Each structure stands twice: as structure tokens, then as C-alpha cells.
Amino acid sequence: MLPLVALVGRPNVGKSTLFNALTLTRDALVHDQPGVTRDRHYGVCRIDGQPLFAVVDTGGMVGKEDGLAGATARQARLAAAEADVVLFVVNVREGVSALDDDILAWLRKLSQPTLLVINKIDGVSDATVHSEFAHYGFSDVVPVSAAHRQGLDDLIEQVLAWLPERGIGEALDEDSERIHIAFVGRPNVGKSTLVNRLLGEERMIVSDVPGTTRDSITVDLERDECRYRLVDTAGLRRKSKVEEAVEKFSAFKTLQVIEQCQVAVLLLDAGEGVTDQDATVLAAILDAGKALVVAMNKWDGLGTYQREQAEDLLSRKLGFVNWAEVVRLSAKHGSGLRELFRAIHRAHVSALRQFSTSEVNKALEIAYQTAPPPSIRGHVSKLRYVHPAGSNPPTFIVHGTRLKVLPDTYKRYLENFFRKRFKLVGTPVRFLFREGDNPYEGRKNVLSERQIQRRRRLMRHVKRK
């Protein structure tokens, strides 16, 4: 495994900025509002593409043991306990605080190798930087400015000196065989509860407060000899409901996760049915063209009549994505999880399937003969040939003439025909239509000089007669 380095400290000392600087990403949310980071957030520090160590960002510790603050502190303690080296991050501009003293006392009891990282040194004199925290007695002190990437090389060098020798781990590797799954949905439908159930630990903070998860958290899982990468995302609300700037950033990162995943699991609250917020999330998945599994959570809490109502509402509101499998489950009690993974696998296989040009042309020929395109204002579209253009989602390019008048109903017919013929489940199917180009369009027949002379001779001969 890759060795693990944990970033701990009080709120707003720059831990997430340092995380982004070390991992060369923007995976952790950064904002001047304290308390933005709540869960553990993992990344990898690399040099020239080679992974050196894993980094875990934690929420700011405020000394409270109740509510979300307490849950955030527990996540930070778990991260520090599993780390090989702890980076205790402080803010030189604000100086020493009582909260820093409390965190240091806890770290000394933990007995983990710890480096003091003095952040935000830009514009501060060297004398102030070295004297402000001198009484802490650290032998290893690294001044940095995470925002300006100042001092990072020294920090990485000191971290490597403390780390044990290990190989590349699978917790945060770039294994291409892993199925990347994004759990998405509106706030408080049970995404974090479901991921915790799958992992068998309290990896995500779970609360009845909507919007508890603000960042997208990535963890790896092995189940039934298969590898997965799970991403728990912040709940997407309608834009009019997204008020805090931080929540807007979270929503944006959720959209990024949808773009990067292979299979999106849309989690619905079975007791509340399909809401406008659910439709917003679904629209983002469809726009990205991702494989889709619909999961009805909290199914065990419904009676027979309520289940019938939920099924009816689902078929009416989500009938246009009837190609997506629907799984009924309970994240809290763990029922339906095997069916969920089976649906994910079927969607993943369908989304990444490769097609030959001959088989898709045969399918187009049968579809065309079974139901030719209708005549639109006296014009009939002609479909000449098709070829595959990509996967995830399966994409096909159809060439022909008068394709601009091809109605949307016929395009949907082709999608459904291909989906049924090739047994594609859980994935959208895209068709692109290209008009056949006339190779002589815009070209003028220009005679050569020899042809012009010959034409003149012929014309003179005709005139004599």
C-alpha cells in the first residue's frame, strides 16, 4: 500500500489548500468559511507521475464532541490513527490559539510521527515564522505557503524521510479495471448511509441534516472478486435552493463526478417519490450520457399500498428512462445490495460494449425494412449505412440523405431497436446523423486550353455547314 499522510488542524488553517497543492488537484473544496471540509478526503502526491504517498484531508477540529462538529472531529482522529505521518497544520498569521494547544496535546498522546507545518508564511518575516510556534518543541518544522506552492518541495522531502518503504497501494491506485460508481441524488436520501453499508464502516458522516456531505468522497471497495471505486457526492438541489457559495461549489463538483464516473446510481427516497430535485439530478446524468441504475431507498419502510403508489409514480415520471433498471433497497438494513451490484454490472458491460461495423449495419438494415422512415412534406429520409463511434455510452453515426427531416420519433425507434437487438440495459444509446455530401457540390467544370481549341474548331465546322 501507499504510505498515508494525514493533514490535521483547526478550521481554516489551509489544510484543503495544502491537500490540493500536494495532489496537484482541486479535489478538496477551499473556502474562507471555516468548516467546509467535514469527511476524510483522499488523494495521491506524485512527482513526474510517480505516486509517492497518499494524503488524507480532514475537517477542522473545534473541540466539540456533539453534532456535526463532533462527527468531523471523529473523522479527523480516525484519519490520524491510520496515518503513517501526521502533518499538524497551523496558521502563522493568526498565531497560536488554545485550540492549537488542545490538538497538539491529543497528537502527543497519539504517538504518531508528526511534522509541524506552518502555513500562510507569504508576507510574514522569517523571524516571526520561526518564533511563533517555537515553544511547541518540534524538531521538524516546515514553513509553507500552500496557496503559492512555496516550501512544498522541502515538505515532501521531509515527509519522505519519515515514511516507511512501501509499494503502490490499491486503496488509491489508478486501476483501470475498477468500476467507477457515483452515488448521486438530492440531499438526505441516504447516499452516505448506503456507502457506509457497502464498506461496513462509518466512513461518511451521516446526519438527518440535509446537505451534510458537501464534498465528493472517493473510496475503493472489493466485493465478490470485483473492484469498485465508490464516490459519495453532495446532494444536488434546484439552483434556486442553492444559497451558500460553498454549496454551489459542492454541486459543481458533483456534476464533475458524474462526468467522470462509469455508472451513476440515482438514489431516490421511496417514501417521497420522484421530485423535481430528482429530475434535476437525472438530467445531469442523461446530459453526461452515463450508465444509470435507479435505486429506491427506504423501501422496507413502506406498506403494500405505499409501494404500489411509489411504483406508479416511478413509471409515470421516469417512463422515458425505462431502459434503466430499478432496484428496491434499504441502505440502513442492507437489503437489496446484491441486486444493486448486479444491475451496476449489467449497465457497465452494456455501456462499454464494442460493436463491429457489420453487425450494426445488419441491425440498421433490419430496422429500416421493419419500419421505414415516414414521409415528411413529401420527403423521405434514406439511411445508407452506420458505423460505431464510441462507448460509454454506445454511440453510432448514421449516414444518409434528407436526414434533417427525420422525425425524433424515428430516432427513438432506432435507439430502442438497437437496445433490444443488442440487449443493452442501463445505458443510453446515442445516434448521430450525417448527410451524404455531394463530392461535386460547388465545383465548376473548367475546360483545358486544348479542349477549348478543339471546341472552337468544331464550332467553325458546324457554322460552315
Swiss-Prot record:
The keyword tRNA-binding does not apply. One of its GO terms (molecular function) is ATP hydrolysis activity. Keywords: GTP-binding, Nucleotide-binding, Repeat, Ribosome biogenesis. One of its GO terms (biological process) is ribosome biogenesis. GTP 2 binds at residues 185-192, 232-236, 297-300. It comes from the Bacteria. Residues 353-437 form the KH-like domain. GTPase that plays an essential role in the late steps of ribosome biogenesis. Belongs to the TRAFAC class TrmE-Era-EngA-EngB-Septin-like GTPase superfamily. EngA (Der) GTPase family. This is GTPase Der. It comes from Xylella fastidiosa (strain 9a5c). The gene is der.
